[in-house]
Each structure stands twice: as structure tokens, then as C-alpha cells.
Regions:
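Divalent metal-dependent phosphate-bond-processing catalytic cores, especially two-metal-ion Mg2+/Mn2+ enzymes
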Residues: 2-59, 64-70, 113-126, 137-356
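N-terminal charged/capping segments associated with class I S-adenosyl-L-methionine
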Residues: 51, 56, 74, 97-102
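Active-site alpha-helix of zinc metalloproteases
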Residues: 131-135
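Short, contiguous, pocket-lining structural segments
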Residues: 76, 99, 103, 124-125, ...
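Hydrophobic alpha-helical transmembrane segments corresponding to the first two to three helices
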Residues: 85, 99-110
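Internal amphipathic alpha-helical repeat/solenoid segments
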Residues: 69-96, 116
Length: 356
């Protein structure tokens, strides 16, 4: 799949009425109750997926933008916003077990909560908040359900296009900005040129930072920021230059992208099952094509519980611990849940067979 594929959308909003939560659903009341919890960590996003009739990203994006009054502040027409959201959601691959529009809705909702953290109160401008939410919405659009490494190893069209560098992340960005050019989909039509340029730069910086190969350097920079942390009189973080501001936003979206293990255990377990199925499907392709099977992708040799503990210990916990330091004490509950979930998976590791 490349950008060349026609980026079309069906306009479901030719009527005058804009649906209350951005999606046509017979479950409006119950959906509304759940979306009322959009600023709570651990909302049941799977239920939102069901109640929104398979359009969780549209519902979450519309609710987040409207509740923050971003449509009025940035002069985004509601119908344009919905036309874009529906089109964006259609360009997520429904057949991917994990990297589909439900994951995008989840990351957007998590980003929305993190932006509300007291340590960041009134730190970011409406344009910056919009950029972060937009980046979360688009960050995996048209994901093929395969890793960067697979795309590079198989000399895919996309790897050729992007010279093996952040292949997927470059593609997600290109598709997202291309979709804005569709008729009636340019949500930034009323921004000044300078604002558009700033927003575009921020979104690119944030989405490229979701490439896991950038994780260690992103975390190193975050640790440095924690060590030199400056706080304004009101107790909120003092971020007085673009480099510091975008660095916090990049890490915020990265945290949201790696937030599954910090959610209530029943949600986390569902996400793990979906991600493993996507990995296994890649492993099946690798086996068929005579390629080496990627780590964690062999369904006949998987150590799911052990993999999760390792993922938490080496990647997720160091990131969230550092984020929690930055916004102390705002993220303590999130960190506690992460540690409980780690202990659960540790306890579920099957005992090794005795040596022969």
C-alpha cells in the first residue's frame, strides 16, 4: 500500500444535521455517557468501538476537539472536521487485529487525558493541543499490520519510497496530510499560513517520534529535562522554547502510544491478545516466504507473558517512570497500575520444563 492509492471518502454528512457525537448510532445515550469520561484514564475504549458502530476514532476525535472548544477557537467547521475524521478512519485498515482505528482512538483518548495533567495546566496553546490530538489521531493511518523491519527486509514499496528510514511513520504522515486535500476535508483551512506551518512541523515531529527505534534517544532527552526541570510560580512546568515544548509533546504522544500496559488489566489483556495476533500473522508470512521469523512473531514458539514483562521492564516502565517524575505527582496512579500489571504477567509465566 502506498500513497498512490486513491484517497477517497464517502460523505455521510450530506444532510444538515451533525450527529451529536459525530457518528450515527442507535446507542447515542450510552455512547454519550462513555464519552463523558474522555478525560478519565482507563475508559472502556472497546465499548466505545461497539457503541459507535465501528467508528471509535471519529467519536473520540470529535468529542475531544469539541469539549476543548478547538473547533471554535481554531475556526474549524464541524462538518469539515467530521468529513476529515470519517475519511481518516476509513484509511485505517479494519482487518489489522491491533493497528486499526480503535488503537488510534485509544491513543487519542490517552493523549487527551495526558494533556489535562495539572503540571501542564495552561502550558500549551490551543494550536499545540490541536497538533498533539491530531498527531495521535493520524499516527498509524494506513498501517499494513507489519513492522518497519519486515518492510525493510522484504524490500517493500514503502521501504523503497522512504529509504528504510522510519518507513511506516513517514507513510502515516504523508497519508494524513494528503487526506486534508480531499474536498471538504481541510480542517485547517482557516488557520494563517504561519499557524499551518507550525502545526505541520509539530505533527511531523510527534508522529516520527512514535518510531520505536527513536525510543532510547527520546527517553534520554526526557531524563535530561527532568534533571533540569524548571517550574513556574504556579507549580506548572516552565517550557519557554520550542525545543522543550515539542520534546514534552513528543514524549506525551509516545507515552499514550505505549499506554496499554498502564490500563486496567482487562483492557491491557485484550490489547496484548490483539497485538500478538498481528505479530503472529507477520510471522506466518515470514515463515511462508522463508524469511527469519521476527522476535515474538512465531505463534508456535511464543512466550507472551515473558515478552510483556520484558517489554515493561526495558521500555514501558523506564518511560512512564520518567514521565511521572516530570509531572510529579500527577501520574502516580498510572505508574502503580503498570507495576501491578507487570506483577500479574510475571506471575503468569509458565514454569520452565525441568532439564532433560
Amino acid at each position: 500500500s502506498g500513497v498512490k492509492r486513491a484517497l477517497t471518502h464517502t460523505n455521510s454528512f450530506t444532510g444538515e444535521r451533525v450527529p451529536r457525537y459525530g457518528v450515527e448510532t442507535p446507542h447515542e445515550e450510552e455512547l454519550g455517557r462513555l464519552l463523558g469520561d474522555l478525560d478519565r484514564w482507563g475508559v472502556d475504549i472497546f465499548r466505545i468501538g461497539d457503541l459507535s458502530c465501528g467508528r471509535p476514532l471519529t467519536a473520540v476525535a470529535y468529542s475531544a476537539f469539541t469539549s476543548r472548544e478547538l473547533l471554535s477557537t481554531l475556526q474549524i467547521p464541524a462538518r469539515t472536521f467530521l468529513a476529515f475524521a470519517v475519511t481518516l478512519e476509513e484509511h485505517y485498515v479494519r482487518d489489522n487485529p491491533f493497528h486499526n482505528s480503535l488503537h488510534a482512538a485509544d491513543v487519542t483518548q490517552s493523549t487527551n487525558v495526558l494533556l489535562n495533567t495539572p503540571a501542564l495546566d495552561a502550558v500549551f496553546t490551543p494550536l499545540e493541543v490541536c497538533a498533539a490530538l491530531f498527531a495521535a489521531c493520524v499516527h498509524d493511518v494506513d498501517h499494513p499490520g507489519l513492522t518497519n523491519q519486515f518492510l525493510v527486509n522484504s524490500s517493500s514499496e514503502l521501504a523503497l519510497m522512504y529509504n528504510d528510514e522510519s518507513v511506516l511513520e513517514n507513510h502515516h504522515l504523508a497519508v494524513a496530510f494528503k487526506l486534508l486535500q480531499n474536498d471538504g476535508c481541510d480542517i485547517f483551512v482557516n488557520l494563517h499560513k504561519k499557524q499551518r506551518q507550525t502545526l505541520r512541523k509539530m505533527v511531523i515531529d510527534m508522529v516520527l517520534s512514535t518510531d520505536m527505534s527513536k525510543h532510547m534517544s527520546l527517553l534520554a532527552d526526557l531524563k535530561t529535562m527532568v534533571e533540569t526541570k524548571k517550574v513556574a510560580g504556579s507549580g506548572v512546568l516552565l517550557l519557554d522554547n520550542y525545543t522543550d515544548r515539542i520534546q514534552v509533546l513528543e514524549n506525551l504522544v509516545h507515552c499514550a502510544d505505549l499506554s496499554n500496559p498502564t490500563k486496567p488489566l482487562p483492557l491491557y489483556k485484550r490489547w496484548v491478545a490483539l497485538l500478538m495476533e498481528e505479530f503472529f500473522q507477520q510471522g506466518d508470512r515470514e515463515r511462508e516466504q522463508g524469511m527469519d521469523i521476527s522476535p515474538m512473531c512465531d505463534r508456535h514458539n511464543a512466550t507472551i507473558e515473558k515478552s510483556q514483562v520484558g517489554f515493561i521492564d526495558y521500555i514501558v516502565h523506564p518511560l512512564w517512570e520518567t514521565w511521572a517524575d516530570l509531572v510529579h505527582p500527577d501520574a502516580q496512579d498510572i505508574l502503580d497500575t503498570l507495576e501491578e500489571n507487570r506483577d500479574y504477567y510475571q506471575s503468569m509465566i509458565p514454569p520452565s520444563p525441568p532439564p532433560a
